[in-house]
Amino acid sequence: MINKNKVTERSGIHDTVKSLSENLRKYIEAQYHIRDEGLIAERRALLQQNETIAQAPYIEATPIYEPGAPYSELPIPEAASNVLTQLSELGIGLYQRPYKHQSQALESFLGEDASDLVIATGTGSGKTESFLMPIIGKLAIESSERPKSASLPGCRAILLYPMNALVNDQLARIRRLFGDSEASKILRSGRCAPVRFGAYTGRTPYPGRRSSRRDELFIKPLFDEFYNKLANNAPVRAELNRIGRWPSKDLDAFYGQSASQAKTYVSGKKTGKQFVLNNWGERLITQPEDRELMTRHEMQNRCPELLITNYSMLEYMLMRPIERNIFEQTKEWLKADEMNELILVLDEAHMYRGAGGAEVALLIRRLCARLDIPRERMRCILTSASLGSIEDGERFAQDLTGLSPTSSRKFRIIEGTRESRPESQIVTSKEANALAEFDLNSFQCVAEDLESAYAAIESLAERMGWQKPMIKDHSTLRNWLFDNLTGFGPIETLIEIVSGKAVKLNILSENLFPDSPQQIAERATDALLALGCYAQRASDGRVLIPTRMHLFYRGLPGLYACIDPDCNQRLGNHSGPTILGRLYTKPLDQCKCASKGRVYELFTHRDCGAAFIRGYVSSEMDFVWHQPNGPLSEDEDIDLVPIDILVEETPHVHSDYQDRWLHIATGRLSKQCQDEDSGYRKVFIPDRVKSGSEITFDECPVCMRKTRSAQNEPSKIMDHVTKGEAPFTTLVRTQISHQPASRPIDGKHPNGGKKVLIFSDGRQKAARLARDIPRDIELDLFRQSIALACSKLKDINREPKPTSVLYLAFLSVLSEHDLLIFDGEDSRKVVMARDEFYRDYNSDLAQAFDDNFSPQESPSRYKIALLKLLCSNYYSLSGTTVGFVEPSQLKSKKMWEDVQSKKLNIESKDVHALAVAWIDTLLTEFAFDESIDSTLRIKAAGFYKPTWGSQGRFGKALRKTLIQHPAMGELYVEVLEEIFRTHLTLGKDGVYFLAPNALRLKIDLLHVWKQCNDCTALMPFALEHSTCLACGSNSVKTVEPSESSYINARKGFWRSPVEEVLVSNSRLLNLSVEEHTAQLSHRDRASVHATTELYELRFQDVLINDNDKPIDVLSCTTTMEVGVDIGSLVAVALRNVPPQRENYQQRAGRAGRRGASVSTVVTYSQNGPHDSYYFLNPERIVAGSPRTPEVKVNNPKIARRHVHSFLVQTFFHELMEQGIYNPTEKTAILEKALGTTRDFFHGAKDTGLNLDSFNNWVKNRILSTNGDLRTSVAAWLPPVLETGGLSASDWFAKVAEEFLNTLHGLAEIVPQIAALVDEENEDDEQTSGGMKFAQEELLEFLFYHGLLPSYAFPTSLCSFLVEKIVKNIRGSFEVRTVQQPQQSISQALSEYAPGRLIVIDRKTYRSGGVFSNALKGELNRARKLFNNPKKFIHCDKCSFVRDPHNNQNSENTCPICGGILKVEIMIQPEVFGPENAKELNEDDREQEITYVTAAQYPQPVDPEDFKFNNGGAHIVFTHAIDQKLVTVNRGKNEGGSSGFSVCCECGAASVYDSYSPAKGAHERPYKYIATKETPRLCSGEYKRVFLGHDFRTDLLLLRITVGSPLVTDTSNAIVLRMYEDALYTIAEALRLAASRHKQLDLDPAEFGSGFRILPTIEEDTQALDLFLYDTLSGGAGYAEVAAANLDDILTATLALLEGCECDTSCTDCLNHFHNQHIQSRLDRKLGASLLRYALYGMVPRCASPDIQVEKLSQLRASLELDGFQCLIKGTQEAPMIVSLNDRSVAVGSYPGLIDRPDFQHDVYKSKNTNAHIAFNEYLLRSNLPQAHQNIRKLLR
């Protein structure tokens, strides 16, 4: 089934750039319909401008580093150089000549300096080898010099990673090196056992003590379902070995299947029956030659030399007794010889910044303490591509690893040395022409057709005078190219320009070929880059110039049009008449054209493309605004309502409209007919105007179609904001189609190994892309396939009827192109039918028909796709002008016979035309094929109808025209319709469906179409050449598809792909897309791979199961979640601009490492300000320098938690090692989790491992004057720790005492009755199935209460639980977890809220349940939440919230604004579940989106007892410890009530609907196996609740007190809103300024900020609180540091607010990725004014007259547009005078914060004017239309 056709869409990078831009443009033109050809041309000119939707591309090459000396020549011990030399000869990743920086690393680490290392080299520089080689060297030296020590167990190196995904990636690399059997022999020399390694993470099987039962549960399935299954599959096993995904051990011997014995029961009920005795005690034993340890128990017995783990697991390992053997063995090994040193590798070290970095820094110090060694005996190697300068890197490394600056041990920063290259040379014209004429297309097909590529190379070699290559294979050709290109002038110039730098592509071409014409320079650049990327040295795999291209795209943020048809500023060169002027992408008041035409937003009708402008009018409707009025007004509101105004030249004669005349320069609207010379133009408004509501057309006044398909549906008169995922899909498809294949195309690899890795910020976005991209592609692919199927049928003289005939031809197309389509069961059915067709007929379609072969019934998705292709408005054959549906030949003949017999006076061609129109009418009603189920019809149509079918009549407008036709009449029409119904339909009771066998599809791209000038409809035929078959008008023109700009713009996007397969014989391309996020990482411990890992393998074309197919596109979140290094990857796509440049560079760096072609990095920007900023300034993100990481080890809050951890760990380990307790059934949980919480607080009398013993132990060992632990702990605490003036020893004692007090306090909340703990369901890093008491294990209890290190991870997590009921091995049914993604509760309250759609693994669920983390078998899982609900007391009108835990006050009036206080029930979710516990039907995509509030600081009932410090004239501050914040999702406020309806038994939940509250029996949101005693449905009562979460953290609290002359009356809505905006602004600026302070230098995400307005205590004063808090629950100590540096921070805050030129806020000052939801509230000038008052007592004053005039400038422009005259007087009494006719008004402005009664503006003293008015500047900015209306009222 291999298709020999090459993909035609291949060529150079300039063509790729052009195609990406063109395809995005075509998509926008096709989806956002415009009718007028002049307007089409104008939009195209705008789209083709640089920076509208595409940014200039940048080219960048990964730098290549200088090779160093061979190992034998390095000044390192001979033992190390010998081993490294031997290993380098094995071809396992170490090369015989390391890079120079790798040599330097070896010399520094192993040589006389014995320095610790920071490997600070870039991507692709061999960082991994840079730390593995020193480890190998140390192992070799130990073997040679200390053989006795070498035989001892103990970790020689710990490799620490931030995430499991990176552990998996590193494990794969280590397997390839240390796991190689030959390498192991070399490393083993001088040792009694192989050097072993092991990964110890949450996924390592299995936690807890080993037992036969648990081996059966957790180990047996790993082997039975994976390892043993693949043992005989040599190719797959070899591939897994190659990529490091197969364990380096003797799996057969380790599993020991032969130890199991068949036995027979000799007594009891089962006497005589056989069973298997597994003898697990004799199995799972490490084999003598094993290099890898794969279970926890292996590593606990004898720890590996290399331990790979993550820092959170290392924390658990230090704490838990079960792992103590690992550290004891290492400790003994270290003691055995003073030359022994532990190596600690911190890969991706730049990630350890901020709170997480401080946590890891203290963990490292505790590790040293646990091993009882000084820091100097721990050798550290840090790696990072982004650590800033040498000094910064050194300081960071010392702080992180605890190395004192005065230590004899030093850090050496290893930086890459760029390789020295031959000098670049001036390119000759001969070289430029030879490169430009190089056959790049053939060369790009090298993976599929080596001979053609070789011929292209041979021709180039001849022209260049190079010796011809001898063709052998790809490797030989690549090596030959490498040799010949090295030293070649153009390539050396290229390397010099782009190595390690980003250069614009056009500048690159000019610099490379300055004397060549542009076209030649571009082609030569394409060839040079392609050759340089393909060239690869065989000896070490070095690519000559690994290159990537950075491309930035975005959609349109909207279109805004000048209303002057004669505008002289138009971008397009369209010479004919048009209906509007220049188009813009931003809102403007006026165009710059000669007439200064007004600019309004452009809307068009989706069906016909008719153009409208969106304006806003008052009830007088005499002036059109371009923007709505704001929400606030000092006077009576004059509401403006939206209006759609038609700007087409002629509406349809039968439509309803009113004529109006719009003044081009001002926007005045007149009912009176105006002369053309008067500056007016004619427009049309809706006929019926309803007061107070949107003024829009019910039917389009051009095409007469309804503008809404249903009452609640959005209008089809739509804006031009590019929406959805489809534009991004278009870019990804283009990106992959232009990518050269990396392997031959065959049945298993239909896309030739092409891959794209997609990154999104957000797991749900990544999941949605994985679901939606295949669906976006599917319909286009189906259209192409059906077009080819029709062509095939035509070739064998078969009619393409939409029956099984078409389905068989469709299968033939799939077979010929090795194509997969659809997914799930539908895909399986198609594959089975396709394979049967291939097997029986070798894909010969004619033969299959001759044999009357009939495939099985087509699957559901085929039927849905066929309905869409025939019936949908926009994507059907006729809708895309690809073809149409007509009667079959036989039916045409029979209908003509009937027409003649009825003596109807009509020509046969008109019967055919009417038949096609009649068929089309029925198709638009989806009345096709009665046998198709109504559920499929609903999915295809996208809407519900209770009954489907048609009356079998012409469309209403056409029927009316036909009846009025002189030669026809009503009877005539009815006879014609009856003939059509008889021959073309099946039906009964007056409901008809088109019969598939009576129809045929006509695919004809050359067909000449007809278009109606009145209604714009496109149709294949017209009646009598001139009558429109849609509306019946007699104004039809002929449209030639190849010449029509309208068809090209509107339909070209869909026509072109069909043309490519029919005319150009292109290969069909489908993409397999899967999600790859942490939410898929839940793994049943019985399976080897989580879903993500399986997808990674398929993305690497490793197909484990027979039915596996390669994944082409992997949709991920962050790079840290991609645990695979796909070196050959050449395409990355970013769905949005990442938050920081390091993120971008890391993601982009995934492409172009070792690929064979130029890599592309495509970024699609959102319309948000953060994305726009980097879209317009790509050089800042592509090549900007990363931030220097800092780790703040002086943070006492974090140190306190590590002290707690050390105390608990030491207490338990000491007592357990002393063996003072008797082993009991609880020993396992004691070893694994420090026992149960209840035992520690209320029991454990037998073991002494309880709070009383701990209390005594702390007092004896620490608090007493001779406590021995005081000094040892003080030794590992950072010297810079902020201890409040205490010595380290005294601070430690103080912390220990406070810890005891905290534990005694917590003892009161721990229940004393113990629950049974099922150890099988427990794990450390994974969520348990749920327990009666939430933190049953002591370790989890201490973590939950924030007493142990959290590593900046949220401790309050929520999960979304997807379950299924399955039959277990015992044959009974049980509930199993399918997926259980987790998020912090603050995120989950928005993303998992009831009503939200959740996409997991391409399945869509609607959140519909909120319950507790209960056991799976529990029936009523929500009861616990309702047993302990909280109260939420808040005001609807303002931000006031009262402490829910302190609600004695019964006052129900808001003390801030006077509104009514509401008391709501608030529950805190633990688990969310899907509606009805199942995924949604495909057609159900409705969701209700609600959001969680920012953290709010509830008001106490009693006065707070804070000791404030003075911070300025009107501001005080304090550092408030352990304050409670609350964050709430209030649902939607509709109908006066908000919140969610939640069942108090099962937790079934939905957004509260006051009109139809949830009630009655309902499905549970989780799986439950019903018994006879329990009904299937839950009948619990629904309650209306808020979903919320409160948490404690530390605050920096600032209190501003405002008084006269500033406004203080917060009961006034304007005053309240103004203060809230000012506080939003200062809070955001404060957060940014604090995070940038030199003592903090944090990611702003580690700080949160907020505000609250306090109740007024004194008259005419108002207190305003701002707070800055640690986002880490329990606090990270940053608020304390901020308080200590508040003067600097407040100065920086004010500078940030005043140091920008924008009006309110922008990306240069306040706007960024994370605050997009509040940017409308940010006003830097207002915030600065309030902060300046608070700090310095400066009262806002009226500005000078000229600045007032500047503030009034927008109002002035608006008034002048409306015909008023504005005179700039420039005096205090009259900054501006506005006049009309003989009346005038003096106008000024004043700061909004000034209180009106205490303030009189000078305009009120003005003379010689009829009136005066002063505007509040805050209101002026937010409600300009209102100010305009106020002036109008004064002058008219």
Curated annotation (Swiss-Prot):
One GO cellular component, as annotated: cytoplasm
- What's the domain of life for this entry? Bacteria
List residues binding ATP: 121-128
Pfam families of this UniProt entry? DEAD, Helicase_C, MZB
Give compartment(s): Cytoplasm
What range(s) does the Helicase ATP-binding domain occupy? 108-405
Q: Where is this motif: DEAH box?
A: 347-350
Picking any one GO molecular function of the record gives:
nucleic acid binding
Q: What does this protein do?
A: Component of antiviral defense system Druantia type I, composed of DruA, DruB, DruC, DruD and DruE. Expression of Druantia in E.coli (strain MG1655) confers resistance to phage lambda, SECphi18, SECphi27 and T4. This protein is probably a helicase.
Protein name stated in the entry: Druantia protein DruE
The organism is: Escherichia coli (strain UMEA 4076-1)
Q: What is the lineage of its organism?
A: Bacteria, Pseudomonadati, Pseudomonadota, Gammaproteobacteria, Enterobacterales
Q: Tell me the gene name.
A: druE
